[in-house]
Amino acid sequence: ENRLIIYVHNLSYEFQFMRKFFKWDKVFAVDERKPIKAVTINGIEFRDSYILSGYSLAKLAENLVSHKIEKMVGDLDYKLIRNSQTELSEKELGYCNNDVEIVLDYIEEQITQYGNITKIPLTNTGRVRQFVKNKCLHSNTSHKKDSVGKNQRYTDLMKECSLSADEYTMLKRCFMGGFTHASMKWSGKTLENVASIDFTSSYPAVMLSEKYPMSKPIKVDLKKESFKELLNNSDVGLMFDCKLIGVHAKNSFESYLSDSKCFDTKGVIANNGRIFQADELTTTITDIDFRIIKACYDIDKVAVTNCYKFYMQYLPKPILQAILELYKNKTTLKGVEGSEVEYLLSKGMLNSVYGMCVTDI
């Protein structure tokens, strides 16, 4: 029943060493070798403060509200070989102690916010998930019938959007991260006088402005339905397996297809993990990907199979309202004296809204 909770900044790194010295009751990991919680048989619970905060130690120190501390730099030589018998100097011990104090101060602020260490969520995404869940399932009014009705409507909607295991696996094959690939013409070189554009809260903005699949996937019989017509229908979204033959990039700096997302490949010339040219490949994509691929590549032949369609609609109103509330708090509380905690919380939660939607199960 009793637990001793210990926070470790980047638990997945430290765990590979410390796992040998404890007997474990249970370990919760988000990926292979990425535990975020580990409990020993005698009740010691290790949690990951890096996953909770989303910040490096240096950035974490900068974002503390009621504590003033900075991460020390340059006082620890990582090139030296050390073992369990190595004595650390006062300067080195000070460096190590400072890192621990940053995490300690952060957790103290979290306890103040949540009232109890056991109430602190495991991840930053967990905070926003609970916030959005409450918006979707409960009414702001004190009337019980309002909350019951809202809860039932949202539950019914989620049932309408549920997936089979095969459909979920296929959607995972479609999923890609952001396109941040460097041009092979300039990779490794230092460029002067460059320009850039930053879209403020770009991911949440797109979640508000665009339509998303709001139905179960429906298998398409391409003998009866025109793929081209479906592709041009803004009320329909598609996912499908796509075989491409004779693939050639139209230019040298926009290689969209990721080599790791392709299978049954032949004659691939890769540009740092991206397909520059291929005799043949198969991949699983959406209609959005397909339009981008057509814009980036010259392709001799395209064969579409295993096609599913979704009916597109804007995200449920409670989710949109939750995003808008977080954005409002982020913008109106910035720089307001006495609202530092609320500002940083809203900023962190807003940045985690997209991550909440693409968390693997």
Language model regions located:
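Conserved acidic
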Residues: 2-10, 15-361
